Structures are given as C-alpha cells and as structure tokens.
Amino acid sequence: MTLCIAANIAAVRARIAHAAEQAGRDAGEITLVGISKTHPAASVRAAFDAGLRDFGENRVQEASAKIDELRAANVLPRWHLVGHLQRNKVAAAVDRFDILHSIDSIRVAEAINERAAIPVRVLIEVNIGGEASKLGVAPEEASALAANIAKMRQLELIGLMTVAPRVDDPEDVRPVFRRLRELRDAIGLRELSMGMTDDFEVAVSEGSTLVRVGRAIFGDRAIEAR
C-alpha cells in the first residue's frame, strides 16, 4: 500500500507541475491536499511518509477519531475540512482542523469566532454553478460574507472554494474555475481551492492554489461511514 500511494502522489505532483508549466505558473504555489475521507489512518500515514503534508476530510465526526489516532502516533499533517460544517460540529472542527474550506453562512462564521482560541484560516464556499444539489453561497453574496468575516478576530479569511459540476469533459468546468478566480481577485484574497481528481489540471491552469485529490492518490473510497 505504501509504495502504491507514494507512486500515486508522485504521479499527481508531476501532472500538477506540467499543468502549471503549461499555464506559466510556479508549481510551488500550488498545494496538493490529499482527500482521505473514508480511508483509514494507515493510508494517511503512508501518504505522510511519502511526503504529503496536507489532508482533507469531509465529515468532522468521521475525521475526529482518525486525526486523534494519528496525533497519538505523532503524525501531524495540516488538516483541511472540505465538507459542510454544521454549527453543532464547530467545537470539534476548530480543535482538529487547520483550515476550513466550506464556510457558507454568517452563523457558522460567528460560531467559529466564538469557539476558536486562536485565529482559524477559512475559505468561503461558493456555488459558482448554481446547482441545487451543492452547498455554498451564491457568487453575488460572497463579497458581503467576506466583509463580515473580515470583522471577526478569530477568523482569517484566505480565499474561496468551489466544487465544480460533474462532467464528462473537464474542459466543460473551465468557466466555473475562471469565474471563481475572477471573484477571488475582485474580493482581494489569496487562495483558490478548486479542482479534484477528474479536473485538477484545468483548475491549475485557471489559478487554483489548493487542489483536492482523493481517488488518484488513495484509490476508490471505502464504504461511506454512516
């Protein structure tokens, strides 16, 4: 397992580097986040041993036991929460995650501000595609939420995140990534969390700084935790 995961990480990094070169970008400004949701702590350990330092999880409850197990083993990567954050999970989230990608309401932001002992890095999730099945604020609401978050002492707003629609051709989501970049630039933020296993090269070419790759590193996900 360890050798397979290490080889997968190397292959993904090579693809990121190629996409960055084609776009005239420095690959060093792009962080690879390994999405380890539904995969065991042993898989995270294997990826960590292969040099990966950033990992993403979707569910606070599922991730908490995994993070605590790895902490006990002195495996201390940066943890990214990329799934929806409910207010009743805020305390557990701020105690375990370094970066929260999915802030989509003032109420959740306020709850984080009240609970966090030290400033927490956050991104606003934007539903660029306007899909009813997706979470995130509408693009026209992002600036107002950003302005409100900027007033909160315990939140450091660093960027925007989106989950692109599922399509057969990755090029079809280029306008989604481009629009998020334009919105990020208009608000004046640094990070862009966009791009997953099937479309991260297009995301890199459109300015992504945080690519969230799961299947290409860890293989097909395990059975979803209920």
Locations of regions flagged by a protein language model:
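Conserved alpha/beta-domain cores
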Residues: M1-D198, V204-E206, F218-R221
